[in-house]
């Protein structure tokens, strides 16, 4: 169920303040955050935000298409190592009929 419109989007106060301070100074620094649930606002565009994935901080460069999404969507928390079982042989199947 989506968040109520009357509440507005959630953006971590400290994160928003740091981004607005950088915008006022025209600086581009990497900003570390643990707030994966913060919504990306138009003020964040052009900045690199290091989002914590549970182990490390993953640098995420914010572009125009990311506005409205959450920071955690761009920092995966799980590593896919492949399915169990032996490796499939290359070209081991029967030839296809046309």
Curated annotation (Swiss-Prot):
Keywords: Ribonucleoprotein, Ribosomal protein, RNA-binding, rRNA-binding
Listed GO CC annotations: cytoplasm; small ribosomal subunit
Domain of life per record: Bacteria
Region Disordered, residue ranges: 77-98
Disulfide bonds: none
One GO MF term: rRNA binding
BP term (GO), one: ribosomal small subunit assembly
Coiled-coil regions listed in the entry: none
Protein's job: Protein S19 forms a complex with S13 that binds strongly to the 16S ribosomal RNA.
Family per record: Belongs to the universal ribosomal protein uS19 family.
The protein's name in its UniProt record: Small ribosomal subunit protein uS19
Species of provenance: Chlorobium limicola (strain DSM 245 / NBRC 103803 / 6330)
Lineage: Bacteria, Pseudomonadati, Chlorobiota, Chlorobiia, Chlorobiales
């Amino acid at each position: 169920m989506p968040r109520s419109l009357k509440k507005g989007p959630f953006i971590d106060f400290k994160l928003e303040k740091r981004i607005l301070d950088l915008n006022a100074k025209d600086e581009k620094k990497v900003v570390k955050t643990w707030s994966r649930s913060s919504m990306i606002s138009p003020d964040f565009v052009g900045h690199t935000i290091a989002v914590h994935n549970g182990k490390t901080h993953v640098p995420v460069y914010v572009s125009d298409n990311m506005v409205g999404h959450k920071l955690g969507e761009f920092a995966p928390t799980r590593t896919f190592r492949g399915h169990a079982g032996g490796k499939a042989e290359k070209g081991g199947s029967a030839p296809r009929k046309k």
